Amino acid sequence: MSKQRIFIAGHRGMVGSAIRRQLEQRGDVELILRTRDELNLLDSRAVHDFFASERIDQVYLAAAKVGGIVANNTYPADFIYQNMMIESNIIHAAHQNDVNKLLFLGSSCIYPKLAKQPMAESELLQGTLEPTNEPYAIAKIAGIKLCESYNRQYGRDYRSVMPTNLYGPHDNFHPSNSHVIPALLRRFHEATAQNAPDVVVWGSGTPMREFLHVDDMAAASIHVMELAHEVWLENTQPMLSHINVGTGVDCTIRELAQTIAKVVGYKGRVVFDASKPDGTPRKLLDVTRLHQLGWYHEISLEAGLASTYQWFLENQDRFRG
């Protein structure tokens, strides 16, 4: 039996590289990989020619333009245009070249700012988005709807997964624009090295957040991609087909900071500056649908933080920032 030819778009990113690591361990697939220099995903002709020549069987669409609040506010046109072009080019070229299986990776920012907690898939389009990343969220919603539309019109098997907050190897550890886990890991690491008496964390520490290790995200993505078509259809709806991916468990920012201090070995005080904004009180995905499909996360938060910190220590000369 010939090997499945699988294209991972975005194989150098945090999620794409995790999917690559897991698929590389198998003997029944052949991975097709292209760097940004080798294939410009914003160029529809180049993407079409690539699909026409490579005979792809499956696509993991993990490529995206990503960034923090400042970048989203500064370059909103770039975020909506580039993400919609990447999705449109890949999904349309896949269809034109008879690729029947595709998995689109989105983001939990697709849900309304004031969505019911925990957020079920049915919360999509039920309210106003968070203004700071609305262009990015709109692009991710468009990706879901592209998949659903090609399924409805052409009978394709294009699926979507929406991850919660991710962390792990190949994350962005830049001091000014990283997400909470890499930011705190780096801050506690530097405080330990400098024997700082305390580390100040913004906010009261009471907001609750959910975190998923990127290796679990990769495993969930492969699980959803490989579900029998009938099973996937039974557990989704044609116009509401995306699947949340998370742990279904959240923790306070205070608990997160204390766990990171423990993992890093920081012995000083952790101080919460309640004069700084807290953000949304709670953000948790409802993963009932994912559990019904037989997938549960395996990596505990403390174990995941420990392995991520180890990766950080081993890659300080190359991490972003």
Regions found by a protein language model. Name each.
Residues 101, 106-107, 144-172, 182-184, ...:
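Conserved beta-loop-beta element that borders a ligand/cofactor-binding pocket
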Residues 88-133, 159:
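Conserved Rossmann-fold NAD(P)-dependent oxidoreductase catalytic core, especially the SDR/UDP-sugar
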Residues 3, 9-10, 14, 18-22, ...:
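C-terminal substrate-binding subdomain of Rossmann-fold SDR/epimerase-dehydratase oxidoreductases
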Residues 44-84, 96:
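NAD(P)H-binding glycine-rich loop region in Rossmannoid oxidoreductase-like domains
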Residues 42, 110-111, 166-168, 180-181, ...:
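Conserved sequence/active-site signature of Rossmann-fold short-chain dehydrogenase/reductase
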Residues 9, 34, 59-65, 102-108, ...:
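SDR active-site strand-loop-helix element
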Residues 24-49:
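Adenosine-cofactor binding site in Rossmann-like domains, unifying the SAM/SAH pocket
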Residues 135, 139-142:
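Active-site helix of classical SDR
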